[in-house]
Design a protein with these regions (language model features):
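Carbohydrate-binding surfaces of carbohydrate-active enzymes
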Residues: 2, 12-18, 30-31, 45-72, ...
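Glycine-centered tight-turn motifs at strand-turn-strand junctions
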Residues: 669-671, 769, 775-782
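Short acidic/polar inter-strand loop motif in beta-rich domains
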Residues: 680-687, 790-799
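C-terminal substrate/ligand-recognition segments
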Residues: 224, 229, 728-736, 743-754
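Membrane-proximal, cysteine-centered motifs at transmembrane boundaries in secretory-pathway
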Residues: 748-756, 763-776, 795-797
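Extracellular beta-strand-rich recognition modules
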Residues: 673-679, 743-745, 784-790
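Acidic/aromatic-lined carbohydrate-recognition and catalytic surfaces
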Residues: 34-130, 141-142, 146-149
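Flexible, surface-exposed loop regions and adjacent strand-edge segments
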Residues: 803-808
């Protein structure tokens, strides 16, 4: 697991070294340094390079490793806009073709907005390397040579942008680069312009598949090959990912030939930033079968593992089981390095990027103290990712020529190749797919090709016009399995991934998110029942073994226990403001020792509605909506009086506290209190609120009142007025431990990370099912203090997204699908038998 470490503000040397120490204490061995929105140092300037020295030096001192990132934000290739702004010949440009009144055609070209580079121009890429890679190599030479620096990450270098043509929208537009027409003539013996005009007149010809094939070859040689050669020469890995990996049409337009391009990296990468884990029909976001398999083919081609960027787009309150599931999806496709989004120095990057919030990082209470749980799981997943699939693997040809033609020609009224549908059907039914290029040889037993109309051909048998269901039936007929998973009625199980490896082991991953499944593992005819938790993984060694714990002899609920409920932090309540910058809070009874927490982070910015930062004076492409703001310090009033915030903030979360100030504690009377933003932008940033109230209070139906200090029962935090609480809540009580041979404690906490202590002993942490703990035998029959600590994400403190109006669209759902957080159920599982209780993965 590799934290994606976003550098914001102006970190001091002490802060840098403390950050590295905090990463290592979680058992994490490396991190990636990422220059992100909110960085207040000159990118690639002296202070930035000195900061990188501090990171590398501290990593070396601790025996850790560092990954570099080759850009400010993304896409890669510009050195924060310097490359294209130095030379218009290096700027992204497109041809545009128009029809004249007489029916002839007119060609023109136009440049993209400033800052967008043409990655198909070798000289532009060479300049990018000179400004970025060479500067790092000179400044960080020691850490290149002693292998502290492992590699450099390149991010979406083929990213598209809108190009505005002065004459209006052309009939067709496409990327222009030097030498294109000569390359086309050499490949076809024809003229590019003649073939484009023929296509415009007749809609006939292969001009677009040829053009995008050539563009892919140029992209590979100009960009990936130059970067790879530089990395090879300096003894580090080239990794990263392309744009539009999930869509064959978008990938063709942006990358030309994604199979060819990704094979240019020494550690091929992918991203899965939507965090999809649900294979049921209609689920959104949908699992990216094409992305995974494009990455897998490149991993197999290179033979040294792969890398995935994960989780970036949230939702922020995804439970750890979801993050684990996506990590294992990567492992099932040969990916063994997991970039975990997002660890930040502070959250000021949200000023520009406030359309999404990642579910990992120390801003989340569960992650801050227990990221090691996910890091430990990453090591297990990586070990399994490096295994070799032994059976039920089929080849599928990537339909690049068809995708390229349709990407440019349009797909209205046409059903194109359904690569996604075939991969999904085969993978969810216990087969493994290996993508191969259109003309590549393979020794796999079945080879499928995608046809128009969403049909398929199989090359070994000569069968054509197959549906995805036909292809599945053919695989089942031709490819027997030594290991498979069945439903209890004996039919093959679906909506899961299954792999069997050459060492005789097998792995099963549940892609049904809410249902534990009672299944049967069949190995060489021997059947073994097992329980597969929702979103869970089950690992089978080469030797068959019982996979279920014995059924408890009795179950005793702790529902009648009276608990003390303590909180690790104050409760907080966002003040929601309307369009006029006014808001209210209603208090039912006086509150003691509360504080107002005021935003102190004001930054100038200009950003498109999709989240792309642009220069404050940059003119956007036609059709881009731009949000512009010039920084104005915040000031607030409460009930007509100015709010004074003399203290540094200690009431929120790490990464948020540095961006806020707080008042001294005060008493808040009962009644309605009115708040106003008298200076500063409107409160339209969901993830960076303007004003909070913090203290020991509860909230019921939007009304605040003192929190009860009495005993509580089991229940969600919202039942106690703590729906917005962000931190760790601990239920504690003296309990009688059952006097049985073996006892296990089972909890339901809404899937949140949970720690249990009994009689002062730490029994450990659980972050996914089963939420069960073995009770020490010497405590049987005794009374002891039971402490159950449940940790939230950061999401609760943002409040209800329906309560405000936000100026940027959310890239993903704001909130995850899991239920309420709390201590929802607790049971003793008593087992009198001598057989040991076995852990279910």
């Amino acid at each position: 697991m590799i934290p994606f470490l976003a550098i914001t503000g102006r970190p001091t040397e002490a802060e840098v070294r403390a950050k590295v120490a905090a990463i290592q204490v979680q058992g994490i061995e490396s991190f990636l340094i990422y220059a992100r929105s909110g960085l207040e140092l000159e990118y690639m300037g002296e202070a930035w390079l000195k900061l990188n020295e501090w990171f590398c030096d501290e990593a070396e001192r601790r025996g850790m490793k560092v990954w570099l990132y080759d850009e400010y934000n993304w896409p890669s290739g510009t050195c924060k806009g310097r490359v294209p702004n130095e030379n218009d010949a290096w700027r992204y440009a497109e041809y545009g073709v128009y029809r004249n009144p007489d029916g002839s055609f007119r060609w023109t070209s136009a440049l993209a907005p400033a800052g967008w580079v043409n990655v198909c121009e070798p000289a532009a890429v060479a300049r990018f390397i000179e400004l970025t890679h060479e500067v790092y190599a000179k400044r960080l030479d020691r850490w290149f040579k002693n292998k502290t620096i492992l590699g450099i990450f390149t991010d979406e270098p083929g990213h598209p942008t809108r190009v505005t043509f002065p004459e209006g929208k052309p009939l067709v537009s496409f990327r222009k680069y030097a030498g294109l027409e000569d390359e086309y003539r050499a490949a076809t013996g024809r003229e590019l312009k003649t073939d484009v005009e023929k296509w415009l007149a007749t809609k006939e010809g292969d001009v677009w598949s040829v053009y995008l094939g050539l563009m892919g070859t140029r992209f590979r040689s100009a960009y990936f090959d130059q970067l790879r050669a530089w990395c090879d020469a300096h003894g580090i890995l080239l990794t990263g990912h392309m744009i539009s990996e999930n869509d064959i049409y978008g990938s063709a337009r942006c990358n030309g030939n994604p199979i060819l391009c990704l094979r240019g990296e020494s550690l091929p990468g992918m991203d899965e930033i939507g965090t999809a884990y649900d294979a049921t029909p209609g689920a959104r976001p949908a699992i990216e079968w094409v992305t995974y398999n494009v990455a897998r083919q490149a991993v197999l081609h290179r033979g040294h593992g792969g890398l995935a960027e994960l989780y970036a787009c949230g939702p922020a309150n995804h439970v750890p089981a979801t993050l684990r599931n996506v990590m294992w999806q990567c492992a099932f496709h040969g990916i063994d390095h997991y970039i975990t989004c997002m660890d930040v120095m502070d959250e000021r990057g949200l000023v520009e990027k406030h359309g999404y919030f990642a579910p990992a990082g120390p801003v989340h209470p569960w992650y801050e103290k227990h990221a090691h749980v996910l890091a430990d799981e990453a090591r297990v997943a990586a070990a399994w990712a490096r295994k070799t699939v032994a059976e039920r693997e089929v080849a599928v040809r990537y339909p690049n020529r068809l995708a390229a033609q349709l990407a440019m020609a349009g797909r209205k009224g046409v059903t194109g190749p359904d690569l996604y549908g075939l991969l999904k059907t085969l993978e969810l039914n216990q087969f493994t797919c290996r993508l191969v290029d259109e003309d590549e040889s393979t020794d796999l037993p079945l080879v499928f090709a995608c046809l128009m109309g969403g049909r398929f051909a199989e090359e070994r048998t000569g069968k054509r016009a197959l549906t995805a269901a036909d292809a599945l039936a053919l695989c089942r007929d031709r490819l027997p399995a030594t290991f498979r998973v069945l439903e209890q009625n004996g039919t093959p199980a679906t909506n899961l991934l299954v792999r069997t490896y050459t060492d005789g082991s097998s792995a099963v991953l549940n892609l049904q998110p809410f249902s534990d499944r009672m299944l049967v593992a069949e190995r060489n005819g021997t059947r073994t029942p097992f329980t597969l938790p929702a979103r869970g993984v089950m690992l089978f060694d080469a030797v068959a073994q019982e996979r279920n714990p014995p059924v408890p002899s009795s179950i005793t609920s702790l529902a009648n226990v009276d608990w003390d409920l303590t909180l690790s932090a104050p409760n907080i309540r966002r003040v929601n403001f309307d369009e006029t910058k006014n808001g209210t809070l209603t208090v039912a009874a006086p509150l003691k020792d509360v504080r107002l927490v005021t935003r102190d982070c004001a930054m100038s910015y200009a950003v498109t509605s999709s989240g792309r930062p642009i220069g404050l004076n940059e003119q956007p492409a036609k059709g881009d909506t731009v949000i512009r703001h010039v920084a104005e310090p915040y000031a607030f009033e409460m009930d007509g009086a100015k709010v004074e915030s003399p203290e540094p903030c200690t009431s929120l979360r790490p990464c948020y506290d540095p961006l806020y100030r707080q008042t001294v504690p005060f008493a808040l009377a009962a009644g309605e209190h009115r708040f106003a933003i008298t200076s500063g932008e409107a409160d339209k940033n969901f993830f960076l609120p303007a004003l909070f109230l913090a203290g020991d209070f509860a909230v019921f139906n939007d009304v605040l009142m003192p929190r009860s200090t009495g005993k509580v029962k089991l229940g969600p935090l919202a039942m106690f007025g703590l729906a917005d609480f962000t931190g760790t809540a601990t239920w504690s009580a003296e309990v009688a431990v059952p006097n049985t041979a073996r006892t296990r404690l089972r909890l339901a906490t809404g899937g949140r990370l949970t720690q249990v202590k009994l009689a002062g002993r730490d029994l450990g942490v659980r972050a996914w099912a089963p939420f069960e703990w073995d009770i020490p035998a010497d405590l049987a029959g005794k009374k002891a203090l039971l402490e159950i600590s449940v940790s939230t994400s950061v999401q609760p403190m943002f409040g209800d997204p329906a309560a405000g109006t936000w100026d940027m669209r959310f890239w993903n759902a704001v909130s995850g699908p899991d239920g309420p957080c709390g201590l929802l159920a607790a049971d003793w599982l008593e087992q009198a038998a001598s057989a040991p209780l076995k852990e279910i993965w």
